[in-house]
């Protein structure tokens, strides 16, 4: 059995889909379905069982055996960069992850988990997986950073696989439940389908991020499980592309050309990553050599998926 925490969420459900595509269906999804809309991410997937994340944690902490576990993909977390309840964030993202990590270490179960490019904070170059480059801007980024630091202490002594992925700007199918945290491509598509003019912040040609397609993210996760490699790795494309490029690809799909530019909100000033670009040196040195989709390629595929029933 393979366990995917956050399996009804964005990246987790895409990992479940990638496993299904390989013929794997003996999957336990762990999540919190208080937001019941997330069920839509699972309706077309095949899983063996579902468990609430709190019930799962109780079983983990009691040391109860869950059966023959091949691996745990730990994608479950509060991923809101605008959430400032630090106690909630640390309980949910840090303590929970530690409990799960130790459960895996004691049983030599491969543990593959979601870290984040938010660990780098507001820097504009050298996104390298090393302490001197890390300075998160928000408590979400801090919770991810601190768990990475915890893993770094344990890695040299670990007898089983531990691998963390610093996800950059992931976009693609199954993110609709994320609301304001969904990608720009998702929001632009929604605006266009509602007959509204698509909106971008002023200066969006200057805001550049490493936008990585979720199908590529899932593929990297599965490759690492098969390879058995451990470590903490950036997971982006290695290319920074502008929000304008995302808009251009979305507009091209919809055969539209006009866009409305809106003022940049004060509440985001100083807390907003204006530039991200993954350094893929470590990922490539680990042996992952497949190409990543460009924004034009990924957004076009995503638009086809979003509008498949239109």
Curated annotation (Swiss-Prot):
It catalyses: ADP-D-glycero-beta-D-manno-heptose = ADP-L-glycero-beta-D-manno-heptose. Pathway: Nucleotide-sugar biosynthesis; ADP-L-glycero-beta-D-manno-heptose biosynthesis; ADP-L-glycero-beta-D-manno-heptose from D-glycero-beta-D-manno-heptose 7-phosphate: step 4/4. HAMAP family: Heptose_epimerase. Contains a large N-terminal NADP-binding domain, and a smaller C-terminal substrate-binding domain. Its EC number is 5.1.3.20. Catalyzes the interconversion between ADP-D-glycero-beta-D-manno-heptose and ADP-L-glycero-beta-D-manno-heptose via an epimerization at carbon 6 of the heptose. This is ADP-L-glycero-D-manno-heptose-6-epimerase. The active site is at residues 140, 178. Its cofactor is NADP(+). Belongs to the NAD(P)-dependent epimerase/dehydratase family. HldD subfamily. Disulfide bonds: none annotated. It comes from Salmonella dublin (strain CT_02021853). Binds 1 NADP(+) per subunit. It holds the Pfam family Epimerase. It comes from the Bacteria. NADP(+) binds at residues 10-11, 31-32, 38, 53, 75-79, 92, 144, 170, 178. One of its GO terms (molecular function) is ADP-glyceromanno-heptose 6-epimerase activity. Keywords: Carbohydrate metabolism, Isomerase, NADP. Substrate binds at residues 169, 180, 187, 201-204, 209, 272. GO terms for biological process: ADP-L-glycero-beta-D-manno-heptose biosynthetic process; carbohydrate metabolic process. Homopentamer. Gene3D superfamilies: NAD(P)-binding Rossmann-like Domain, UDP-galactose 4-epimerase, domain 1.
């Amino acid at each position: 059995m393979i366990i995917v925490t956050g399996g009804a969420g964005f990246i987790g459900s895409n990992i479940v889909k990638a496993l299904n595509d390989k013929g794997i269906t003996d999957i336990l999804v762990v999540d919190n379905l208080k937001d019941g809309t997330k069920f839509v991410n699972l309706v077309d997937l095949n899983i063996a069982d579902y468990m609430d994340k709190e019930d799962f944690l109780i079983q983990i902490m009691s040391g109860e055996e869950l059966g023959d576990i091949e691996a745990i993909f730990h994608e479950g977390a509060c991923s809101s960069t605008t959430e400032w309840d630090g106690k909630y964030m640390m309980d949910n993202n840090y303590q929970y992850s530690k409990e799960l990590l130790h459960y895996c270490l004691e049983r030599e179960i491969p543990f593959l988990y979601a870290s984040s490019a938010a660990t780098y904070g507001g820097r504009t170059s050298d996104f390298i997986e090393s302490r001197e480059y890390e300075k998160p801007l928000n408590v979400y980024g801090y919770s991810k950073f601190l768990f990475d630091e915890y893993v770094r202490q344990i890695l040299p002594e670990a007898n089983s696989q531990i691998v963390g992925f610093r996800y950059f700007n992931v976009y693609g199918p199954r993110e609709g439940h994320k609301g304001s945290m969904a990608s720009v491509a998702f929001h632009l598509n929604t605006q266009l389908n509602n007959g509204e003019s698509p909106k971008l912040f002023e200066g969006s040609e200057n805001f550049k991020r490493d936008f990585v397609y979720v199908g590529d993210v899932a593929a990297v996760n599965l490759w690492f499980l098969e390879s058995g490699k451990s470590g903490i790795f950036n997971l982006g494309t290695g290319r920074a592309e502008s929000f304008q490029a995302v808009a251009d690809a979305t507009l091209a799909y919809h055969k539209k050309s006009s866009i409305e530019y809106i003022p940049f909100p004060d509440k985001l000033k100083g807390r907003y990553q204006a530039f991200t670009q993954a350094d893929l040196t470590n990922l490539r040195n680990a042996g992952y050599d497949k190409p990543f989709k460009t924004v034009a390629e990924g957004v076009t595929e995503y638009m086809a998926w979003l509008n498949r029933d239109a």
